[in-house]
Design a protein with these regions (language model features):
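Extracytoplasmic gate region of multi-pass secondary transporters
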Residues: 25-30, 180-227
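Cytoplasmic membrane-interface "Motif A"-like loop-to-helix N-cap segments
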Residues: 65-79, 235-248
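Intracellular juxtamembrane helix-capping segments at the cytosolic ends
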Residues: 102-118, 272-288
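Symmetry-related core transmembrane helices of the 12-TM Major Facilitator Superfamily/SLC fold
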Residues: 146-166, 317-338
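A late C-terminal transmembrane helix in Major Facilitator Superfamily
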Residues: 287-322
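Helix-loop boundary and gating motifs at the non-cytosolic
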Residues: 2-50, 197-210, 309
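C-terminal transmembrane helical hairpin of 12-TM major facilitator-type secondary transporters
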Residues: 240-278
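Central cavity-lining transmembrane alpha-helices of secondary-active solute carriers
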Residues: 43-64, 217-229
Length: 344
């Protein structure tokens, strides 16, 4: 694959668009689609949006791996998001547009960041990082001016992306899509488990201090910083040392100091360093199918969230879950990374 260096600019733009896109979707859901007295409608919106935005990503990823045209798909996804959020459409039409638009955008961003990575993780971490900030801003900032600003910025950055020359010059022919290697399948299933665990922990690891909307936005900021930092750190010291350094420290922080704001924030940063690592390792399993690889791991975030929601509802013990989850995630990433290193 031959890549123009200006692709770096596009990934930076897509990272900021990630914040805007997730912010637009969160604002539209919480300040429009959820505004009803019917609990049934709220449940339909919740399940419908997350099914479209997350569970459809492997399908869109596979299709885009086959047809390409990332820049066109990016433009279409942003138009769908703007129309679905800024225009007075019916509830379910808006739901469809922002759900599908969100899924398509994430696949495009994932593919571009993987194109650029070239065995580096920093740009994967950069793209995925700001989504958490967008979700928090869209959820907890209630003024309509927030949506207007996000939409205008999305149109500006989207236009810049659209009119930039396509940076991907040559892409090698893709082999047929198949997973017949049992060892590779085992690694993929383990990575899916690791991502599911991260989603469960994101739902269950709540602070023991008062979490005002402002504090929740700051927590999201540190989660974003952790994703970006994970990619940068792994490029310097490797995946193995990154998880051996960050995950045990996050376990200590979450286990003993959830009532301390500053240690909780630092632990959140450390725990989220694993996101670009799992994406990188997954792409090594699905070489040439970057979109499907990215979409597969993204799709299980919703499943993990539901499991975490059930865990909280049943009031099951948190500290046991914390210890098992972090230790298991640590060993999964170490195991899969060792398999990837041996195959190179």
């Amino acid at each position: 694959m031959k890549i123009n260096t200006s692709l770096k600019v596009k990934v930076w733009l897509l990272s900021f668009l990630h914040l805007l896109v997730d912010g637009i979707c969160a604002y539209t859901i919480f300040n429009r689609l959820y505004i009803t007295e019917s609990n049934t409608i709220i449940i339909i919106v919740f399940i419908g949006y997350n099914t479209l935005a997350f569970l459809s990503q492997p399908l869109f990823g596979y299709i885009m791996d086959k047809i390409g045209n990332e820049n066109i798909v990016l433009t279409i996804s942003l138009i769908m998001l703007v129309v679905g959020s800024a225009f007075p459409l019916s509830r379910y039409l808006s739901l469809f547009l922002i759900g599908i638009g969100n899924a398509m955008f994430h696949i495009v961003g994932g593919k571009y960041s993987i194109y650029l990575s070239c065995d580096k993780l920093a740009y994967l971490g950069l793209f995925v990082s700001l989504g958490a900030c967008g979700l928090a801003l869209g959820t907890y900032l209630y003024k309509s001016i927030v949506l207007k600003i996000f939409v205008v910025l999305t149109l500006i950055l989207g236009s810049i992306c659209h009119f930039r020359k396509d940076e991907i010059i040559i892409v090698e022919p893709k082999p047929s899509f198949k997973i017949s290697d049992k060892k590779k399948m085992k690694c993929i299933m383990l990575l899916i488990l690791a991502v599911t665990i991260r989603a469960i922990m994101g739902k269950t690891t709540t602070p023991l201090f008062e979490a005002t909307p402002d504090v929740l936005i700051v927590i999201a900021l540190f989660a974003s910083l952790g994703k970006a930092f994970g990619g940068i750190l792994a490029d310097f010291i490797g995946i193995r040392w990154t998880v051996m350094l960050t995950l045990p420290l996050s376990l200590i922080g979450y286990f003993f100091f959830r009532s301390n704001l500053y240690i909780y924030l630092f632990s959140t940063l450390l725990f989220n360093t694993t996101m670009p690592l799992t994406l990188f390792l997954s792409n090594k399993m699905f070489q040439y199918y970057e979109g499907f690889s990215f979409g597969l791991l993204a799709s299980v975030l919703f499943i993990g969230y539901l499991i975490g929601e059930l865990y909280v509802y049943l009031n099951l013990p948190y500290l046991l879950l914390l210890c098992v989850s972090i230790v298991l995630t640590l060993f999964i990433i170490l195991y899969v990374n060792r398999k990837v290193e041996k195959s190179v």
